[in-house]
Amino acid sequence: MKIVIGGASSVGKSLVGYLSLGNNDIVVVDKDAAKLEDIAKEYDIQPVKGSISNPDIQESVGMKKADMLIAVTENDEVNLVACQVAYTLFGVPRKIARVDSQYFLNPLWNKLYNEKSLPVDLVITPDIEIAKFLLGLYKLPGSMAVYPFLNGNLNVFSFKQKDTDIPFMKFSLKHINSKLAELSAAVVMILRGNHRILVNEDEVYLQRNDVIYIACPTESNIDVMRLFGVDHNPYEKTVIFGANAISYYMSSQLENDDNVISCSVVESNVDKAHKLAEHLNKTSVIAGKMMSDRILEDAGFSSADISVAVTENDKDNLLISLLASKNKDTQAVSLINSKEYNLLATNIRNNTIIDRSVITISGILQYLRRARINEAYALGREMGEIWEIRLGDDSSNVGQSIKDLQMPENSAVLAIYQGNEFIYNPTDYQIKEDDKLIVYVSPADIKAVERIFYR
């Protein structure tokens, strides 16, 4: 697939980081030569200096042969014009634009986005999506990620198994899932180091530090977590590092959360701090050096339940999380923009990594993948994806059993939603019209699974 990306800042770079893992021909256009040089050192891309909204530039990069344009510069107008040019002059079939300004996002103006006005197939707001992902962790304290499916009726969530004294540690996953069935839940996958275990074997037992993925009706999430020794202790005290769109959206939502007692934002840039403070009511915004003992004390860092580092600097985010991890009761969360810091981040105790590329790409997966996808999430770089597949009466899959699908060995149908019933880790089930399938797809199997569930 030929993909043209407009913008080489953090959002554009994060997209390249994920898309470069596939068999894609990627062109990156930006006016900043230094940013292009930086991204070209790390990834196999074609860097082009110029404005993505310029017709001459689009022609020079072969836009006529492009399968997709993703315009993610920091200028909304440039992104929208780029999509218009790509459609009108070059007939690009799929066009995605980053839009941050609220006036462009107002539902009243949704009719702007069509072929007769602004031909944009999908509008994305990466920073807001990151903030929403972070807020999802507040709904299920102790989790590493929460992925909502079926219009919010089902969650697939992950957590690290730290407690080895629970009864479940003595039993096979087959036995555990028989118990979880009482809550209409199931363990659907385990990540052990870099090895993924799909739950289709009888003799699999939990080990300490396994990352466990559970599918569960939303209302039973907390009860299931408790069975694995994870107590539901709300994040009452929050400290966020970095004044930006992510921290603003998070803080504004947390101000209305009855479980939150205090929220502080620390920002080293005085102007940014003042600007953020003007738009918040209950949040304490503190300007000063983020590593300063006095600033950390003013923010209540030592007693925080959760520390969220979302600055634009990966090193700062990791240092903050390293400090937070010294307090065993503080959950550390760090935003990572570059893959080179992932390994370091995983070695920080109590640290949850938020990979910008993974969150950003999740928002556009249903446009990237050639399958009938309602919802899709990337789990991490080279960790695969989870798709919600919808099956209509014209689907060739209707009437087949799960075995008949001949799923690749490293991918699996995790769950089926039929009527009001959840069926987990199915094998002999016969697919019916209007069933919804939750499918794990390994990175190497994406094309094969696309063929199985082709639109």
Predicted regions and their residues:
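Cytosolic regulatory regions of ion transport systems
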Residues: 1-455
